A protein has these predicted regions:
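A compositional/biophysical signature of low hydrophobicity enriched in polar/charged and small residues
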Residues: 1-157
């Protein structure tokens, strides 16, 4: 069942704004920011997790320091597509560490992959040994990221 934002009150929205910006806060620190005691704050945050508003907590790593700073968006077109082929492609892509994001898209192409590797040579290896080996792909168009102009991990609430 899909939830809607109308079931949240202003305190819930405050919690979402704050943890989206800094998920490392302790419950006590979060409680101070929203002017509630610790127990109700803890219960609200856990409820937001159970309801699916908070999907998880992550550390954002520096891609360059992790030798994953060579970023490419791949527009993948399939020769044919059906449920079996789509499921197989999704399962295969999920196993590739180089792919950090994968979207089923409309328009020109069927999938958009975000690939993060250390170099052009590693990208070529990925294309030849992984993506290029998947049957039913008719075309891969690569878009190399020269600079990141905007990168956010949240959105306005």
């Amino acid at each position: 069942m899909e939830t809607i934002i109308h079931e949240l009150d202003e305190i819930d929205l405050q919690i979402l704004r704050i943890v989206q910006d800094n998920s490392r806060l302790t419950t006590k620190e979060l409680a101070q920011k929203i002017h509630l005691s610790v127990t109700p704050t803890y219960e609200r945050q856990r409820r937001l997790e159970r309801m699916g508003y908070i999907k998880g907590y992550v550390a954002v790593l520096d891609a360059n320091k992790m030798e994953r700073g060579f970023m490419v968006f791949c527009n993948v077109s399939m020769k044919q597509i059906n449920k079996q082929i789509a499921n197989s492609f999704c399962e295969t892509v999920a196993a590739w560490n180089e792919v950090t994001e994968c979207y089923n898209i409309s328009g020109d192409g069927d999938y958009l992959l975000k690939v993060c590797v250390s170099s052009m040579q590693k990208y070529q290896q990925f294309i030849l040994e992984k993506l290029g080996e998947f049957p039913y792909i008719s075309q891969v168009r690569s878009f190399f990221v020269m600079d990141t102009l905007k990168l956010t991990y949240g959105f306005p609430i």
